[in-house]
Curated annotation (Swiss-Prot):
Record's subcellular location: Membrane
Membrane topology per record: Single-pass membrane protein
Name of protein: Glioma pathogenesis-related protein 1
PROSITE patterns hit by this protein: CRISP_1
Sorted UniProt keywords: Membrane, Signal, Transmembrane, Transmembrane helix
InterPro entries: Allrgn_V5/Tpx1_CS, CAP_dom, CAP_sf, CRISP-related, V5_allergen-like
Origin: domain of life: Eukaryota
Organism of this sequence: Mus musculus (Mouse)
Transmembrane segments: 224-244
UniProt entry tagged with the keyword Transmembrane helix: yes
Amino acid sequence: MQVILAVIVWMASSVSSSSFTASTLPDITNEDFIKECVQVHNQLRSKVSPPARNMLYMSWDPKLAQIAKAWTKSCEFKHNPQLHSRIHPNFTALGENIWLGSLSIFSVSSAISAWYEEIKHYDFSTRKCRHVCGHYTQVVWADSYKLGCAVQLCPNGANFICDYGPAGNYPTWPYKQGATCSDCPKDDKCLNSLCINPRRDQVSRYYSVDYPDWPIYLRNRYTSLFLIAKSVLLLLSVIITIWVKHKYPNLVLLD
């Protein structure tokens, strides 16, 4: 799950006509953006080698996209420190992949494919990694079935983040090797080598709480400071009341 920092020199003559600009970067509600994020992930998950017998289909989650968007806006090129703090109503921990590169070369497909390309460093039989593999293993983590992505223009380039639920990258294999779909959960069907379930794959639209523009960890920090200060003031008021009653026993305190 390490951060990819892409330092790329790109000649103006090679910029694609489909490149994004600061004003055309897609929002997390953009249907084409959502479709591409989901489609590319599932295409890559369906072609893993060796084949997977328990690879779940990934579907979009608006809350994960909100969390990713809030963190991209911080322009802090490191993982969200709240990923294991149950910031999602359905998952105790989240996975996260980060891509940083020139806006002129950014595309959803190229960013996600760059994560998947880490497969060349990963030995499935031994789970050994020769370089960086965490982005690849999260993309193909069989039990991660929800994702939400966001992209933000930052001073150093385009910051593209995908968050996953439940989190992957535990000290075990990313998926079970075997005949495709031979170990899908009960009631699942097989489609393009992926385990699908309409109920599980339904896109929830009931989330109504939006994260503010400032980073999640700052919001939690300020909330904690407020609660601590409130507790300290309450304790001080109790101590002062006891001291006054002890010092002036005949004093009548008005409520």
